């Protein structure tokens, strides 16, 4: 007959931050005050037989495991340990400090733009020939997480199909600036350094006033 394995999801505890001299006996001694223990094991180095800094304790019931994990700063063998249910992993030491460090290390160029929208193209109301397209060295920024300066050198030239534009520009006589939007098709980043991509600005012809044509 096969022995039914006991579910230890809510009873098995991960214990981190243990000193080198911690043993199975000392680990069990700390946790036995919270309830009955099925197993207490310190993971040791094969060569030195010393603690590798972590171990596992399996309590007999869920309530005992919850009591053992309640203390946010447990001291085991004279050292502050990290105790949490094994399936959840180690507890973060300090959520506030971890958040502060993460914000300080975040470069402003990597901050995501609202809604992840790509930059828009402006169509100024200048009197030029219809459908005239003038290339200008304006970098195209597709990914909100890519460094703006490095992107101009990392991107390869995009095909004209990737720049499908929708002329939603208003009439120049209204005095409003029209906007076009790029296609959501994105090309993969190139590992080699290339020339900055060329964006295109399209100028709409301006309608002449009837009194000026006389």
UniProtKB/Swiss-Prot annotation:
Domain RRM: 11-88
Keyword RNA-binding: yes
Entry comment describing in which tissues the protein is expressed: Strongly expressed in the nervous system. Expressed at early neurula stages of development.
Keyword terms, alphabetized: Cytoplasm, Developmental protein, Differentiation, mRNA processing, mRNA splicing, Nucleus, RNA-binding
Subcellular location per the Swiss-Prot or TrEMBL entry: Cytoplasm, Cytosol; Nucleus
Signal peptide positions on this chain: none
Main location: cytoplasm
Superkingdom in the source lineage: Eukaryota
GO BP: any one term: RNA splicing
Gene Ontology cellular component annotations, sorted alphabetically: cytosol; nucleus
InterPro entries linked: Nucleotide-bd_a/b_plait_sf (IPR012677), RBD_domain_sf (IPR035979), RNA-binding_reg (IPR050886), RRM_dom (IPR000504)
Keyword Protein biosynthesis tagged: no
Gene Ontology MF term list: mRNA 3'-UTR binding
Function of the protein: RNA-binding protein that specifically bind the 3'-UTR of VegT transcripts, leading to maintain their stability and stimulate their translation, thereby playing a role in germ layer formation. VegT is a localized maternal determinant essentially required for endoderm formation. Also has some proneural function in the open neural plate and in the context of retinogenesis. May also act as a mRNA splicing factor. May play a role in myogenic differentiation.
Family of the protein in this entry: Belongs to the RBM38 family.
Name assigned to this protein: RNA-binding protein 38
Encoding gene (name): rbm38
